[in-house]
Amino acid sequence: MKQKCVLIITDGIGYNKNSKFNAFEAAKKPSYEKLFKEVPNSLLKTSGLAVGLPEGQMGNSEVGHMCIGSGRIIYQNLVRINKAIENKELEKNENLQKLLAKCKRVHIIGLYSDGGVHSMDTHFKAMLEICAKNGNEVFAHAITDGRDVSPKSGLNFIKDLKGFCENLGVHFATLCGRFYAMDRDKRWDRVKEYYECLLGKAYKVPNLLEYLQKSYDENVTDEFIKAAQNENYKGMREEDGIIFINFRNDRMKQLVEVLNSKDFKEFEREKIFENLLTMSVYDDKFKLPVLFEKEKIENTLAQVISKAGLSQLHTAETEKYAHVTFFFNGGKEELLENETRVLIPSPKVKTYDEKPQMSAFEVCDAVKKGIEKGEDFIVVNFANGDMVGHTGDFNAAIKAVEAVDTCLGEIIECAKKHDYAFIITSDHGNCEAMQDEKGNLLTNHTTFDVFVFVQAKGVSKIKDNMGLSNIAASVLKILDLEIPKEMNEALF
């Protein structure tokens, strides 16, 4: 069976039997049509317990890529934190106790929704409660979502938070959309707006809930809410404690850097803060205490390939580069021996409905070059289905799928020419459900299964009831390498 192999991850493209508001179904996609007819295919589970999340919880790119790259189900921080809250372990956490003892005033910052991709509203509330019951003066800084949940769901979430804060005697201090507070693309002007807000230098309002409603009236939805502060909030002091409740790292790193790094040069800062505590490890370069340390994941797909002396290429555009490197490699940043990484810059547009093809064709070229060079294994992510799906623009999402389809056709042709096997799948769905039955926009991921196609010597059928954790062993089987005991079985 031994063959070189390309693993193609078509981010945000899932299977929805309902063709209404389904951008995948509506797209012209000759490459996919050919795959369905000619290549062994099946469906994989990408949500809930199949990827280490709570039952019914939609999957996401971080979890999906970790599952694919490690070849096993890793119980995600979301599940670990839920358990720690239930069994009261969180309030006993040593790093949390140290911060609460040291700092009288404590600020809780995070995305406030039940999306479960970056954070969870229940975690935010649990932290407010622990800090308030400890006798600290507590400030809530809510970041509105509108991306992993519907665009105007923030009103109910913020109403809930405001009432919760009032009952606890906690200050509801600031409000800001994730577009500003959670940028990950080095748009420092956005982060600066939020930094100024935390310092008490933003637009002041008597009621943050009314401010949110007013933003809706002006057609500004949750993701894009401009930073505002309660008129009684006077800003953070340098001796205050700051707790970040997002468990996913990629969209909190820049904010932590702005608040804490002594070497930060992107804009002038009035204050730097030392007493920070993060929910998980945001970046190894931050020497900060964390609530939930990383679980060590050994014998990942990339490690096994590297140890065997084979070469591998990991490529994607900016938006998904961390997913095919850091997350795919089991939460490790370091480059492995014989591993090459190619980062293709994402287009500089405000939202990707402005350019639905994104940088797919450049990513496609990088893959073809890798095949022509003879890389033993290539993993690539096409971001379009997900990133354009998040905009809620149905027509743009159709164009996104069509761009991916064109790229698939080119890669498949190149793979066949050079006798490569290929596996095509997605980390989760998104663009296959762009509106609900009432016509409300759906910008979030779905819980639908995703397609998997395997073209390799000797493969004629894929087993039933498989998930993302069965892909790594499949790649190793194609490469004729030993499958480590930590991995789940192959798809065939």
Curated annotation (Swiss-Prot):
Keywords: Glycolysis, Isomerase, Manganese, Metal-binding. Mn(2+) 2 binds at residues 11, 61, 427-428. Binds 2 manganese ions per subunit. Its EC number is 5.4.2.12. Its cofactor is Mn(2+). It catalyses: (2R)-2-phosphoglycerate = (2R)-3-phosphoglycerate. GO terms for cellular component: cytosol. Pathway: Carbohydrate degradation; glycolysis; pyruvate from D-glyceraldehyde 3-phosphate: step 3/5. Catalyzes the interconversion of 2-phosphoglycerate and 3-phosphoglycerate. Monomer. This is 2,3-bisphosphoglycerate-independent phosphoglycerate mutase. The lineage of its organism: Bacteria, Pseudomonadati, Campylobacterota, Epsilonproteobacteria, Campylobacterales.
